[in-house]
């Protein structure tokens, strides 16, 4: 009887360990901030981003950290500005970018906003972890308007303090990953991904390479994922 109990205990332990190892190996469907960041006392909103043929991404918008950025994003979403626009730039192990009416990274809305990040005089406590949403911009610190990106991997060293992070994914990272996996191979840069001569460890050299190889822009218009809508939710989603 004792031997049987020991065998059963060992089997149960093995099953539990297997479950833990399996769950650790699977990418989470949310940014780690969704479980670890305290939102008490903060002004927050939630937005749903619907991407045709891929699914929905729900993001938390932190207006305490980035009030100008969040107000701008909400205004554009409620006006229907994003409806029908596309994710035009996709880079594996970095981010997916959309929100440009020109569909190529050259456009934006009619109004630029002040960049809410440290190098522009605004403290911002949201690091660019996998699942964080942030504003794209040109070389000018106050040039962001409508283009945004969602990190599909951590990019703390290259982006923190330089770009206005304003929220994070609470559900739908699987959608971000699916977009990356399916569409990144359709960029010119994909042919050189993991080429050690052209693609050294993440840092300044990456940006030079991206600029020379189309900057991660999806080559064919038909391959760019379509944003069906972005709507601001009037309820708190479960996550």
Give the location of each predicted region:
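Bacterial N-terminal signal peptides that target proteins for export
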Residues: 1-11
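Hydrophobic core
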Residues: 12, 16-20
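Cyclophilin-like peptidyl-prolyl cis-trans isomerases
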Residues: 21-239
């Amino acid at each position: 009887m004792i031997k049987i109990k020991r065998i059963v205990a060992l089997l149960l332990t093995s099953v539990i360990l297997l479950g833990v190892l399996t769950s650790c190996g699977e990418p989470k469907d949310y940014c780690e901030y969704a479980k670890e960041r305290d939102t008490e006392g903060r002004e927050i909103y939630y937005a749903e981003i619907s991407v045709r043929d891929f699914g929905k991404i729900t993001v938390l918008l932190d207006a305490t950290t980035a009030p100008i950025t969040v107000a701008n994003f909400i205004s554009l979403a409620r006006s229907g500005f994003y409806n029908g626009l596309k994710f035009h730039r996709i880079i594996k192990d970095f981010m997916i970018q959309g929100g440009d009416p020109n569909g190529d990274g050259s456009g934006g809305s009619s109004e630029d906003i002040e960049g809410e990040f440290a190098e522009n005089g605004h403290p911002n406590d949201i690091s660019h972890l996998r699942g964080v949403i942030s504003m794209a911009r040109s070389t000018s610190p106050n040039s962001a308007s409508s283009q945004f990106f969602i990190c599909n991997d951590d990019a703390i060293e290259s982006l923190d303090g330089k770009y206005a992070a304003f929220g994070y994914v609470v559900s739908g990272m699987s959608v971000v990953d699916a977009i990356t996996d399916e569409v990144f191979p359709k960029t010119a840069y994909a042919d050189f991904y993991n080429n050690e001569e052209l693609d050294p460890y993440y840092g300044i050299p990456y940006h030079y390479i991206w600029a020379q190889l189309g900057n991660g822009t999806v080559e064919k218009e038909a391959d760019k994922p379509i944003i069906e809508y972005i709507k601001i939710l009037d309820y708190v989603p479960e996550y």
